[in-house]
Amino acid sequence: MKQRKGVLIILDGLGDRPIKELGGKTPLEYANTPTMDYLAKIGILGQQDPIKPGQPAGSDTAHLSIFGYDPYKSYRGRGYFEALGVGLELDEDDLAFRVNFATLENGVITDRRAGRISTEEAHELAKAIQENVDIPVDFIFKGATGHRAVLVLKGMAEGYKVGENDPHEAGKPPHPFTWEDEASKKVAEILEEFVKKAHEVLDKHPINEKRRKEGKPVANYLLIRGAGTYPNIPMKFTEQWKVKAAAVVAVALVKGVAKAIGFDVYTPKGATGEYNTDEMAKARKAVELLKDYDFVFIHFKPTDAAGHDNNPKLKAELIERADRMIKYIVDHVDLEDVVIAITGDHSTPCEVMNHSGDPVPLLIAGGGVRADYTEKFGEREAMRGGLGRIRGHDIVPIMMDLMNRTEKFGA
């Protein structure tokens, strides 16, 4: 029996809701996607709930679920994955956080992403914090992608029950850090001191002086959340399925998840995880990796950002760019020898400007697939698909079975 290879493509935040501006269509339905529509015609569609119906999923828990893990058992906070994704090697007693560079004016957060500052600016600001902030514990502060960064408090894992200072919307002041026990109280006090001292460093930094003169939001404040410790990963993906797996990813969080479950991670030049990402560089790398790997995962981030920014036409344009990326892959493989799955890690509807509990469209095509009667890849067409409505953790087992890499249960 011939074993096939697998390609899993996640278009981050793909799912959406009908939008008046797009004639009542979703961005996916509005976009011109000839390659995904072709795959829909020769493949099978469905809907998937990353966690469960009606439950908005974080990108971390959603990816864990899609890779086949129970996030309720495996997940111990986002911070660890963020830190792993920026190349940090953590000890089991370290406590990691995800961080946003933000804009603070008159005690109020006016922009949670500091005008989406560039990765280069964020890295320079992070370096200034690492070199100029002094707190009672050893720490690592490192820029990630765009406005994102990572904070690690060495040896403070017992204080993981600490809250966050992120108000989650502009126009509100930062929250005080909450705590549940003495260990987390100590962490909360350290974080308050860290944020205060970092603000002093950031507010007068030359990058922010320049941004002020240009009328851009300054990155003068840190929003800290997602306390995370070592996750509970019972078995690596690569061990469970006996495959050699690679990930083509730019975003730190998703890099971290992939690394944690045993993937080799690649970030080709030009892949940024931002609007300016080079999706064709990802396509070329994926095709190259398929020569040596059994399973290749490709992550495309900008669709999610457009949903958060409530920009439906941009989201549609980004989906069209993703379609061209997928075309390159399809043109360079034999679909009889490969199983391709395309979905999102969650829905990020433009009207919500955040993750929602809406199901996500799912497409599977390639060797062994029993095609249904769907004609186009979109949310409403997916409702008619032969896969029905499944959970995110069902995707990989379905792929592996089509790849002829599963074993019989029972005699």
From Swiss-Prot:
<dbReference type="Pfam" id="PF10143">
    <property type="entry name" value="PhosphMutase"/>
</dbReference>
<protein>
    <recommendedName>
        <fullName>2,3-bisphosphoglycerate-independent phosphoglycerate mutase</fullName>
        <ecNumber>5.4.2.12</ecNumber>
    </recommendedName>
</protein>
<comment type="similarity">
    <text>Belongs to the BPG-independent phosphoglycerate mutase family. A-PGAM subfamily.</text>
</comment>
<dbReference type="InterPro" id="IPR017850">
    <property type="entry name" value="Alkaline_phosphatase_core_sf"/>
</dbReference>
<dbReference type="InterPro" id="IPR042253">
    <property type="entry name" value="Pglycerate_mutase_ApgM_sf"/>
</dbReference>
<dbReference type="Pfam" id="PF01676">
    <property type="entry name" value="Metalloenzyme"/>
</dbReference>
<comment type="subunit">
    <text>Homotetramer.</text>
</comment>
<comment type="pathway">
    <text>Carbohydrate degradation; glycolysis; pyruvate from D-glyceraldehyde 3-phosphate: step 3/5.</text>
</comment>
<keyword id="KW-0460">Magnesium</keyword>
<dbReference type="InterPro" id="IPR023665">
    <property type="entry name" value="ApgAM_prokaryotes"/>
</dbReference>
<dbReference type="GO" id="GO:0046872">
    <property type="term" value="F:metal ion binding"/>
</dbReference>
<keyword id="KW-0413">Isomerase</keyword>
<dbReference type="InterPro" id="IPR006124">
    <property type="entry name" value="Metalloenzyme"/>
</dbReference>
<dbReference type="GO" id="GO:0004619">
    <property type="term" value="F:phosphoglycerate mutase activity"/>
</dbReference>
<dbReference type="GO" id="GO:0006096">
    <property type="term" value="P:glycolytic process"/>
</dbReference>
<dbReference type="InterPro" id="IPR004456">
    <property type="entry name" value="Pglycerate_mutase_ApgM"/>
</dbReference>
<comment type="function">
    <text>Catalyzes the interconversion of 2-phosphoglycerate and 3-phosphoglycerate.</text>
</comment>
<keyword id="KW-0324">Glycolysis</keyword>
